[in-house]
């Protein structure tokens, strides 16, 4: 990845938004979260998408560029997770992010409520043959030690965790095995990014700042990181 900062899933909501990322300083292009069927349920606005099959041509197009493409997926069953991961991997996605951080996922799949379900989901996700990671909710109902052990055992590469102490820092302190950590929310400055990387994060995702600033956020963060590094 050319730069350690990327957009968060769901922040680039149109094909034009996604294509604009190609000319930016982002380290990767993260797509909107996709489901097996088109999702238009009014109670779950954050999950609305046209269905995975409408995004596959865009993945194939983006895969021809130098930037990594991250497909974000959500499913109601372990089988749906496995199916979506394989579909996007075959289309050329560089990595697959399965979100557990959504109310619809918590109400249907509920991957963090049962160790057997978690292992089944993680195994099917990792079987796609691409690097995979899981996006965690702000509050995880199981011990991080058990969570990370299950993910690593199944072959999942990393997790996306919040910037709060109860998120990525606590996870890294309690994790029984090495796992890549991507900080998923709450960072707004180059200083924030540097601190997260110094604490062990592999990369960060930006959500609200990207929505307000657009693709210019990446160049700004890069400039701020350079200034911080030069001042030390």
Question: What is the meaning of each model-derived region?
Answer:
Residues 40-49, 100-116, 138, 142-177, ...:
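Glycine/Thr-rich beta-alpha phosphate-binding loop at enzyme active sites
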Residues 46-68, 112-138, 167-183, 221-232:
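Alpha-helix-loop-beta-strand connector modules within alpha/beta enzyme cores
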Residues 5-9, 27-31, 69-73, 96-98, ...:
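Hydrophobic faces of well-ordered beta-strands that scaffold small-molecule active sites
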Residues 21-24, 57-66, 85-93, 123-127, ...:
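Acidic (Asp/Glu)-rich catalytic clusters
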Residues 16-21, 79-90, 140-154, 175-183, ...:
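Catalytic cores of alpha/beta
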Residues 31-37, 95-105, 158-167, 187, ...:
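Glycine-rich phosphate-binding active-site loops on the catalytic face of alpha/beta enzymes
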Residues 1-69, 74-79, 221:
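N-terminal capping/small domains of soluble enzymes
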Residues 2, 26, 66-68, 93, ...:
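A general structural motif
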């Amino acid at each position: 990845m050319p730069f350690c900062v990327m957009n968060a899933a769901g922040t680039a909501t149109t094909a034009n938004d996604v294509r604009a990322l190609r000319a930016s300083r982002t380290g990767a292009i993260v797509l909107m979260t996709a489901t097996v069927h088109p999702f238009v349920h009014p109670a779950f606005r954050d999950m609305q998408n046209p269905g995975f099959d409408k995004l596959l041509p865009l993945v194939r197009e983006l895969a021809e560029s130098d930037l990594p493409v991250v497909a974000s997926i959500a499913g109601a069953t372990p089988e749906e997770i496995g199916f979506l991961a394989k579909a996007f991997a075959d289309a050329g996605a560089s990595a697959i992010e399965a979100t557990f951080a959504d109310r619809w996922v918590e109400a249907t799949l509920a991957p963090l409520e049962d160790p057997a379900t978690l292992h089944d989901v993680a195994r099917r996700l990792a079987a796609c043959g691409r690097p995979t990671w899981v996006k965690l909710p702000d509050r995880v109902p199981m011990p991080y030690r058990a969570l990370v052990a299950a993910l690593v055992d199944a072959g999942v590469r990393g997790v996306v965790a919040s910037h709060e102490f109860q998120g990525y820092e606590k996870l890294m302190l309690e994790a029984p095995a090495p796992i890549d950590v991507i900080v998923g929310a709450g960072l707004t400055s180059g200083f924030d990014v540097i601190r997260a990387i110094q604490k062990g994060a592999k990369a960060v995702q930006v959500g609200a700042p990207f929505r307000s600033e657009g693709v210019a956020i990446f160049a700004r963060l890069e400039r701020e990181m350079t200034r911080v590094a030069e001042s030390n």
